Design a protein with these regions (language model features):
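Short alpha-helical segments that sit at the start of domains
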Residues: 1-23
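Short, amphipathic alpha-helical "recognition" segments used to contact nucleic acids or chromatin
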Residues: 21-31
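Minor-groove-contacting beta-hairpin "wing" of winged helix-turn-helix DNA-binding domains
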Residues: 71-78
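A short, conserved structural fragment
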Residues: 60-70
Length: 80
């Protein structure tokens, strides 16, 4: 049975996979949460920056990413 999280990530389809893999390839714990970084991901993956923001926002909402004290950065959350 698909959970709501699975359904939402499925909505992003291949875009989610491209963004996830690109972020993984950076080997960074802190991920920049700025328009500049979202445009950088767009240039590297071809996924529109607005979609990148939606993916990161949803990742924050479901706990894939965590907030930091600096609003310009998010972190990878530990896998539960």
């Amino acid at each position: 049975m698909m959970t709501n999280n699975d359904k939402m990530l499925a909505q992003f389809g291949a875009d989610w996979v491209k963004v996830r893999d690109y972020i993984k390839s950076l080997n960074m714990f802190y991920i920049s949460y700025t328009p500049t970084f979202m445009v950088r991901i767009e240039k590297e993956t071809g996924v529109p920056a607005n979609t990148v923001k939606s993916i990161l926002d949803y990742g924050l909402q479901i706990g894939l990413y965590g907030k930091t004290s600096d609003r310009d950065y998010i972190t990878l959350s530990p896998v539960k």
